[in-house]
Amino acid sequence: MAVLGKGQAHGACSLLHAAALGYGASMALDLSITVRLLDKPSKRTVEDDDRVLDALLQSWIRAGHPLPDGHELEDLHWGVKSAIPKKQGLKSSAATCIAALRALGDATDVHPSNHELVAMAAEAQMASGVSLTGSIDDAWACLEPGWKLVDVQAPIAEGVLMDQAGLNPEDWVVLLVPVSYTHLRAHET
């Protein structure tokens, strides 16, 4: 099994939800994900029930980018190692898309601009049904450190209204409380 390309991204959390307001803001978190593009299936099962990685390959092709030399779609497989809990609001789908796009770029020596990466991630997330809005602000936050305020109605290349490098990680702490724990505590009272 050969690693054709490798990409990384990180999780994020919403500060302002785009679906209700048309403006979204998300902040990067120190939760990493690494995606590898492989020529054979990974030894570890990749859980992609929503098929966002398949949709992402289609977005890559629609954008006019090549597949790795000598490989067809059916020859490509993924390996994912993630510290981002799924379905907890920590932007695991957006981070997976960004890391996978970076792996494709690494495998093909094609390096789309950041706004092109966000556009392909948004297209894949909507096509796979994991997002109604494309999670544009989430993809930006998974792509770069800090936080961004994004106008999701604007063209992606022009949609970042404000951004900031973020807080010094030494100055703040994010606590992740599993949903099951909060349900248990609610029933005890």
Residue ranges and their predicted role:
Residues M1-Q88:
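ATP-binding N-lobe of GHMP and related small-molecule kinases
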Residues L4, L15, I156-M162:
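Local beta-strand/beta-hairpin segments that build beta-sheet-rich folds
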Residues G7-Q8, H17-A18, S26-L29, S131-G134, ...:
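Solvent-exposed alpha-helices and their adjacent loops that cap or buttress functional pockets
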Residues D39, L143, V152, D171-S180:
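Short, structured patches in soluble enzyme cores that scaffold and shape functional sites
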Residues L73-E158:
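Gly/Ser-rich oxyanion-binding loop with an adjacent helix/lid
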Residues T182-T189:
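Conserved small/polar residues in nucleotide/adenosyl-binding loops
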